[in-house]
Amino acid sequence: MATFIPQECLRAAPWKNGGGSTMEIAISPPGAGLMEFDWRISLATITASGPFSSFPGIDRSLMLVDGDSVQLTLDGTRKVTLSAAQPMLWFPGEAAVLAQVKGTTTDFNVMTRRDRCRHQLEKITAPGKLARRSAATLLFIAGEGHVLARGGEQQFALARHDALLLDADDAQEWRLDALQRSAVLCVDLFT
């Protein structure tokens, strides 16, 4: 059964280093902690430059959803700037990552435990169609405007930063309708 996750139900947890906060969107298994999850999807708001936490054995994807840019230095050598031109990055969770920001940014964050599952993150556009590729799929509205997601007998009205978690019992084909073009982040989770 599809689970609608409205933005107003997300709660921010401040980082220990004081450089930002995280709002967990979904986690599996439900109620798992940072050491037990198979996968975790969240929004991270970065307010100050500093290091990321290390997550050994975890594969991560980040996509910039708000703010101008964030410059990431991985393992002291590889520099990547997340911006509108290059909004997404995949990296291993054990990498030493240093973030440099000039203003507040918000990143969509997907983490999967490497020995249990994997993920694929892509940006799609509504209006359009979605053919699911996995038993668990999460849709996140990153753009402005509203999106009506319809699959089988179900339909959900989604606004900016709302999410919809689809499981194996939900339709494989979905229609995403919108009055204006809107960016939708689609996460396929493979277990």
Tell what function each PLM region has.
Residues 1-191:
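Jelly-roll (double-stranded beta-helix
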